[in-house]
Amino acid sequence: MGVGMQDIKRRIKSVNSTKQITKAMELVSSAKLRKARLKLEKTRPYFKVVEETINDIVSSTQGIRHDLITPREVKKTAYIVITADRGLSGGYNANVIKAAVNHLQEKERVSIIAIGKKGRGFFRKRGYDLDGEFTKISENPSFSDAQGIGKLGMELYKQELVDELYLVYTEFVSTITHKPRVVKLLPLEPQTGGEGAEKPKERDEFMSYEPSPEEVLDYLIPKYIESMLYGALVESSTSQQGATRVAMESATDNATDMIDGLQLQYNRARQASITQEIAEIVSGAEALK
């Protein structure tokens, strides 16, 4: 067997080993995606109601001063950026980081609360201030994770170490479609929405808050922040699993195509080798005549 054929066989073996790995990862990510989607389907309606409720309340408390809804001069802005702890997810990490960078370029001073090793590594390498980092939670986030992140963000805001707080995450649309989003968390303000969105409800003059509007907001706003963060973590986790599944499926398909191409090269080389051997035998027989 010629050196060329041996090399092709080694390459086929190597690519086939890689294919087995990517296929296994595809199956694992498919199982994780199914689990994440079930979690998302259960949590999404609840957090949508929470968002609409707090929006209605804030809209009806115009004129009431509260630290978490009253804007102030912006000297520094913090961004909570949700990424994954690992790669192999196509453009998932790059897209959400790009959305964050595009938005923060408009700010004078910024700091980052990094969720996931990929985001932490990106912003640390480029010299951004890191107010906090959370790892090993991106694949299977819990509500307590959201509470810890929310507590840090609100403390920074209350202590006036930052004057705005944004959340950057990836919304899950479908297995192959994921949409980076940038949402302002603090100071809290009514969401006007885009075209077709419902108009904010008019203030109810007879609405009252016990014991006081400020104390009601003291309780509700932290719950809202935690809910938004948990919803974003679940959306991002589902998007990550979808991106990983698609990436591994594509890698497996590419490996299959490569093996087919190498097998064709091997068959042609083998055919050429056999033809050459036959020609040499015939030539030798002719020489003996």
Swiss-Prot record:
Molecular function terms from GO: ATP binding; proton-transporting ATP synthase activity, rotational mechanism
Membrane-topology descriptor: Peripheral membrane protein
Family listed: Belongs to the ATPase gamma chain family.
Cellular localisation: Cell membrane
Known role: Produces ATP from ADP in the presence of a proton gradient across the membrane. The gamma chain is believed to be important in regulating ATPase activity and the flow of protons through the CF(0) complex.
Keywords associated with the record: ATP synthesis, Cell membrane, CF(1), Hydrogen ion transport, Ion transport, Membrane, Transport
Regions that span the bilayer: none
Gene Ontology cellular-component annotations: plasma membrane; proton-transporting ATP synthase complex
SUPFAM superfamilies (UniProt xref): ATP synthase (F1-ATPase), gamma subunit
Lineage per the UniProt record: Bacteria, Bacillati, Bacillota, Clostridia, Peptostreptococcales
Record's protein name: ATP synthase gamma chain
GO biological process: proton motive force-driven plasma membrane ATP synthesis
Gene field: atpG
InterPro entries on file: ATP_synth_F1_ATPase_gsu (IPR035968), ATP_synth_F1_gsu (IPR000131), ATP_synth_F1_gsu_CS (IPR023632)
PROSITE patterns in the record: ATPASE_GAMMA
Subunit structure: F-type ATPases have 2 components, CF(1) - the catalytic core - and CF(0) - the membrane proton channel. CF(1) has five subunits: alpha(3), beta(3), gamma(1), delta(1), epsilon(1). CF(0) has three main subunits: a, b and c.
Superkingdom of source: Bacteria
